[in-house]
């Protein structure tokens, strides 16, 4: 798939990225290079390869969930800029 300046312009507009006209052609060349690399990756034979979520095959040890009374609320909120009745007070962000 070849990417031209018009495609870069369209993608930039959809992404709401201000792109000067003189940068469209260099960006198209860079994106074409990336697409070539992706096409090379698509040609790699991965049959028989187990999908990986990590290159290190290590898991985390599980522990039993234990219900506790929690920490000292006064001590936890002592560093807060503002707290009321041991609750953090934060600026309102939703009307």
From Swiss-Prot:
Membrane as UniProt keyword: no
The keyword Transit peptide belongs to this UniProt entry's keyword annotation: no
PANTHER family: GLUTAMYL-TRNA(GLN) AMIDOTRANSFERASE SUBUNIT C, MITOCHONDRIAL
Entry EC no(s): 6.3.5.-
Catalytic activity: L-glutamyl-tRNA(Gln) + L-glutamine + ATP + H2O = L-glutaminyl-tRNA(Gln) + L-glutamate + ADP + phosphate + H(+); L-aspartyl-tRNA(Asn) + L-glutamine + ATP + H2O = L-asparaginyl-tRNA(Asn) + L-glutamate + ADP + phosphate + 2 H(+)
Protein name, entry field: Aspartyl/glutamyl-tRNA(Asn/Gln) amidotransferase subunit C
The protein's assembly and partners: Heterotrimer of A, B and C subunits.
GO molecular function terms noted in the UniProt entry: asparaginyl-tRNA synthase (glutamine-hydrolyzing) activity; ATP binding; glutaminyl-tRNA synthase (glutamine-hydrolyzing) activity
Alphabetical GO biological process terms: glutaminyl-tRNAGln biosynthesis via transamidation; regulation of translational fidelity; translation
Highest taxon of the lineage: Bacteria
Gene, per the UniProt record: gatC
A Pfam family assignment: GatC
